[in-house]
Amino acid sequence: MKETDFARYLTHFLSVYLPGQVGSKRNTQLAYRDSFSLLLKYCRDQENLSPEKLTIAKVDKELVVRFLQWLEDERNCKASTRNQRLAAIHSFFSFLMVEEPQYIQQCQQVLSIPMKKADKPPLMYL
């Protein structure tokens, strides 16, 4: 099986960049890994894009927006969970923009997806 650019950069992002260059905590690394596991499952099950054939060019703004909507509609995720998944995707595309400048426009489009306002819990005063 031929390695795709998405597989190569996602592997580097999760196993080298986050723990080494960024120094992220193990829980952050696991949360990011889980976010991309969900994205890959979404691509396979909803978009008919097999993970082993997924390329960076296919993971565009429209796909990410559909993924986020799927999280809310089908998995009943709250805005805060959706925003956590989006933060992982944003972080990856920020990394990718520097590693592969030819994707800068696509990266900027994905990075333009805003966080959704999440309900804040009421303040409890004594």
Role assignments for model-derived ranges:
Residues 2-4:
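Blade/loop signatures of beta-propeller domains
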Residues 6, 31:
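Gly/serine-rich nucleotide phosphate-binding loop at the start of the catalytic core
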Residues 11-27, 33, 37-121:
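N-terminal core-binding DNA-recognition domain of tyrosine recombinases/integrases
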Residues 124-126:
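NUDIX/MutT-family hydrolases
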